[in-house]
Amino acid sequence: TAVLTRTGDYFIPLQERRRIARYQHKADIFISVHADAAENRSAKGASVFALSLKGAGTATSRFARMLAERENRSDLIGGAAIEAGDDTLRNVLADMVVAGSLDHSLHMGRNILDRFTGLTHLHSKHVEQAGFAVLKEPGMVSLLVETGFISNPEEEEKLTDKQHQRDLAKAIFEGVL
């Protein structure tokens, strides 16, 4: 059963999104689906990201690092406060638990990219990794899927098309199976 962590266009802090999936819905898999944006209006293509266990500042590409930094800052923009007691030790322990589900995340990400092939342009043909805060739920298979660049007029047209949305959703669903 798939469930949404939100039903409209409003902000939910990154940690709360994970809590909703894990504790309200007892999810085994967490997929954060986005439409990307870039200053360069010719940027295009879908991407799939998994967590990097090498630390918040490391990533498999410059693009992955920049995207993770931007996504992780969304809590600051959304007004979420850093929780009391956040420290390096908690992050290290969480990273250790997350490592167990990373292989499954990478496998599932490759499956999704395979199903996107022919459906949409791929920005990256392999699963990228970076320190996305939204993916740091210990023990949960998790991915961030960028469905394309809404800042690109051609992709915006596709991303707002209901049939294309259904096709992307089906590709993600089949990639999970």
Model-predicted regions and their roles:
Residues T1-L177:
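Active-site-proximal helix/loop segments of hydrolytic enzymes
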